[in-house]
């Protein structure tokens, strides 16, 4: 018997059921890589950020996440070059789905018990997503805005339900507005740290603040 279609597991009906010592024998998720492109690009290299945002409360299978990741990556590599972007899949499939296998061969009615003992065996994993939750983000240079929108639009077709594409007002993957970001870096209130930044508050020892601004 093959894998059951993902439409059977689309809705969030039950409580989260993660892999644990009580829920064993869970097959590995199809998606293993969540960051691709130029992951180590400094925060000031990729100011533009686009998000794919879910418009439904549903479950997305690990196979669908992997298909969307491959689709977006292939388009971005073709249009921006392999070092011109950074894609991050923001969902992780932790919820385990089950299947109560039924025999469909001749004489199966003598072997199986129908709905007696119907708690199934683990079949795969899905990610539970809420309305307004980000599924996938891409950061890149400002001139690649159309390519980001097109890559996310193509990746949308791999998912059920409805998603929206949103170009963020923030700088890259940070939580600071793009129009304030460069001023805050110049004032040394933000220190670039990989693909993120460290925020330096105006509190703390005065000599530490003087050493930073000297």
Swiss-Prot record:
UniProt keywords (A-Z) are: Citrullination, Cytoplasm, Developmental protein, Isopeptide bond, Ribonucleoprotein, Ribosomal protein, Ubl conjugation
Which Gene3D superfamilies does the record match to this protein? 3.30.60.300, Ribosomal protein L10e/L16
Residue positions, PTM Citrulline: 32
Q: Name one GO molecular function term.
A: structural constituent of ribosome
Q: Which PROSITE patterns match?
A: RIBOSOMAL_L10E
Crosslink site: Glycyl lysine isopeptide (Lys-Gly) (interchain with G-Cter in ubiquitin)? 188
Its GO biological process annotations read: regulation of translation; translation
Source taxon at top rank = Eukaryota
State a GO cellular component annotated for this protein. Answer: cytosolic large ribosomal subunit
Q: Name one Pfam family in it.
A: Ribosomal_L16
Q: Where in the cell is it found?
A: Cytoplasm
Q: Where is this cross-link: Glycyl lysine isopeptide (Lys-Gly) (interchain with G-Cter in SUMO2)?
A: 175
Looking up InterPro entries in the UniProt record yields: Ribosomal_uL16 (IPR047873), Ribosomal_uL16_CS_euk_arc (IPR018255), Ribosomal_uL16_dom (IPR016180), Ribosomal_uL16_euk_arch (IPR001197), Ribosomal_uL16_sf (IPR036920)
PTM field: Citrullinated by PADI4. Ufmylated by UFL1.
Q: What does this protein do?
A: Component of the large ribosomal subunit. Plays a role in the formation of actively translating ribosomes. May play a role in the embryonic brain development.
Q: Which family does it belong to?
A: Belongs to the universal ribosomal protein uL16 family.
Record note on quaternary structure: Component of the large ribosomal subunit. Mature ribosomes consist of a small (40S) and a large (60S) subunit. The 40S subunit contains about 33 different proteins and 1 molecule of RNA (18S). The 60S subunit contains about 49 different proteins and 3 molecules of RNA (28S, 5.8S and 5S).
User: Under what name is this protein listed?
Assistant: Large ribosomal subunit protein uL16
The record lists the organism as Oryctolagus cuniculus (Rabbit)
Report which gene this protein is encoded by: RPL10
